[in-house]
Amino acid sequence: MQEINNTQYFRVQKQPEIVVKDVIDIVYLALTEKGYNPVNQIVGYIMSGDPTYITNHRNARSLIMKVERDEILEELMHYYIDNHLKRR
């Protein structure tokens, strides 16, 4: 039996940092593979917050719920601006 005066240590392993771009890529692929229109489904999720817009295929629903919807929108806006507006 351990002595009651000793302190036990509990170490929590750091979760790998989630990259929003990678989440979007995986979700897009999963939705496409299941035959859904990925744009409609992702927009539905962003607008409503309802995760049932996203398939469970490839763990996409769980992944997308790990990032904030505003972070997804921000990533999409950065991509659009960088690739369409800054070139003009």
Curated annotation (Swiss-Prot):
Q: Which InterPro entries match?
A: IreB
Disulphide connectivity of cysteines: none
Q: Which family does it belong to?
A: Belongs to the UPF0297 family.
Q: Tell me the protein's name.
A: UPF0297 protein Cphy_2298
**Organism lineage string:** Bacteria, Bacillati, Bacillota, Clostridia, Lachnospirales
